[in-house]
Amino acid sequence: MAKKSMIAKQKRPAKFSTREYNRCKICGRPHGYLKKYGICRICFRELAYKGEIPGVRKASW
């Protein structure tokens, strides 16, 4: 989980557009962000295992 101060800092408007970055909507993690889903890879994996993301299932070949 991200610190509350870091989440609050990210919500403020940045002075420059290049300083803006994405955070996971669930845990606030800034790295491993999946743009299509708006969450990080760890939260994506947990939700996919639970079957809460429609159209996503474990691959096997």
UniProtKB/Swiss-Prot annotation:
CC cofactor: Zn(2+)
Annotated Zn(2+) binding sites: 24, 27, 40, 43
Keyword Ribonucleoprotein found: yes
Keywords annotated in UniProt: Metal-binding, Ribonucleoprotein, Ribosomal protein, RNA-binding, rRNA-binding, Zinc
Cofactor note: Binds 1 zinc ion per subunit.
Top-rank taxon, per record: Bacteria
Alphabetized GO MF terms: rRNA binding; structural constituent of ribosome; zinc ion binding
Keyword Lipid metabolism on entry: no
Similarity section: Belongs to the universal ribosomal protein uS14 family. Zinc-binding uS14 subfamily.
PANTHER family, per the entry: 30S RIBOSOMAL PROTEIN S14, SMALL RIBOSOMAL SUBUNIT PROTEIN US14M
Complexes and interactors: Part of the 30S ribosomal subunit. Contacts proteins S3 and S10.
Protein name, per record: Small ribosomal subunit protein uS14
Species in which this protein is naturally found: Finegoldia magna (strain ATCC 29328 / DSM 20472 / WAL 2508) (Peptostreptococcus magnus)
Underlying gene: rpsZ
